[in-house]
């Protein structure tokens, strides 16, 4: 029977340290409840002595969260421990996590103490924390650079004092998997009372090895892994919990352990953390990145369509995503194009695959990714691989300031005529969008707005990528200009042209259907 690896989440403590602005109590509670749904065993939610705001956050979460154990951090200082206990006492059960540097470098240059002093401080603090709870974790800060003899001594002393979890952090991400696994093995072999506590690991990603170090530690006997959602954390970040969790699930036959995580909540939790923390997830991020389950190569797409296991070691559904994503690009094959048309409900008799694929390749070479509405337009109304511009931005002006509501005037070329409108909004971009929407009158909802810089200095361009929802369907648009408001307006106009084209497709399909009925 496999053993459980306890998942200890520190997104709201160690992860928050990476953010430019502190999270509100409400935002922290949102994340805590999401972590609870996901099934984390322990959540470290703050450092109560650090500020009144952190104290209030810890107390609020301790009151609201019922199915995960709430934990707070404290230095090996009496006041820290007492304040942590006060913040947590409203919870039915809680953990106090005390930490103290143990490496020679930290002891001499930071603490300016002797190792014997550190040993005594660790024992005293663990005992003090045990006065409040029987769940006490002790962390040997910078354990990765602590001499193994000293590490064994402090671990043994902390367990004797009452620590039920011993955490071995690679605080600066210095160790390699072979080295870190060796540290855990040495502890099991040399600490006589090691069986009285759970060994935990907390790895940072400075050399990009936090997940590998954590998995190696599990193989060596560690039974708790600490980390954050999306790898949030200081410097290069923490061990990415979703990666460790899925590695344990996917490689269960090798690791022989399991977690109690609800895997289908992983993606939703990741997206929530990204949104609240304003930390975008890189597209190539393992498990939760937008490309993690995307296939662009024609060979890969064909292989996935024949058997998903050809190129997928886990399913998107296993983390809460709905389906495989086949990105249609110039590298896509005929099978992928045909599959996408079938998914949209078209049969072979509805279009000519040869001519569609030829037109698709030419369009993909020009624009990169081709979307569903592009395919339909190529199949039914536009064989020239050009995106027709029914709408074109002719002119816009904006007035805004700190004490006035933003107002925009817009002129839009609509086919053969020019229409103009004015509107107010919550900022200049919103005002321009409101004015354009008054002209076109399409029911749309902005789903995504992303601004990125192209180039540097005064010649830099602002690229705006947006996604809107129109009658349950997603449409994409891109705008590029030196002025952010202008690039935003161009992106929306691009979207509107895509929507207009989709409407033309529907009209053409209706016309063809009517002609077929008349022929019958």
Curated annotation (Swiss-Prot):
Q: Which CDD domains match?
A: DRE_TIM_IPMS
Its localization reads: Cytoplasm
- Organism encoding this protein: Yersinia pestis
Q: For this UniProt record, give its keywords in alphabetical order, as a comma-separated list.
A: Amino-acid biosynthesis, Branched-chain amino acid biosynthesis, Cytoplasm, Leucine biosynthesis, Manganese, Metal-binding, Transferase
In residue numbers, the region (Regulatory domain) covers 392-520
Top EC class, one word: transferase
Query: Mainly localized where?
Result: cytoplasm
Name of the protein this chain belongs to:
2-isopropylmalate synthase
- Source superkingdom: Bacteria
Concerning its family, UniProt says:
Belongs to the alpha-IPM synthase/homocitrate synthase family. LeuA type 1 subfamily.
From the UniProt record, give the pathway where this protein acts: Amino-acid biosynthesis; L-leucine biosynthesis; L-leucine from 3-methyl-2-oxobutanoate: step 1/4
Any idea where the Pyruvate carboxyltransferase domain is?
A: 5-267
Q: What is its EC number?
A: 2.3.3.13
**Alphabetized GO MF terms:** 2-isopropylmalate synthase activity; acetyl-CoA C-acetyltransferase activity; manganese ion binding
**Which reaction does this enzyme catalyse, per its entry?**
3-methyl-2-oxobutanoate + acetyl-CoA + H2O = (2S)-2-isopropylmalate + CoA + H(+)
Name the lineage: Bacteria, Pseudomonadati, Pseudomonadota, Gammaproteobacteria, Enterobacterales
Q: Which cofactor does it need?
A: Mn(2+)
The record's note on quaternary structure and interaction partners says: Homodimer.
Q: Which SUPFAM superfamilies match?
A: 2-isopropylmalate synthase LeuA, allosteric (dimerisation) domain, Aldolase
* GO terms for cellular component: cytosol
Residues that, per the record, bind Mn(2+): 14, 202, 204, 238
For this entry, list what GO says about its biological process. L-leucine biosynthetic process
Function per UniProt: Catalyzes the condensation of the acetyl group of acetyl-CoA with 3-methyl-2-oxobutanoate (2-ketoisovalerate) to form 3-carboxy-3-hydroxy-4-methylpentanoate (2-isopropylmalate).
Question: Which residue ranges traverse the bilayer?
Answer: none
Q: Which InterPro entries does the record match to this protein? A: 2-IPM_HCS-like, 2-isopropylmalate_synth_dimer, AIPM/Hcit_synth_CS, Aldolase_TIM, LeuA/HCS_post-cat, LeuA_allosteric_dom_sf, LeuA_bact_synth, PYR_CT
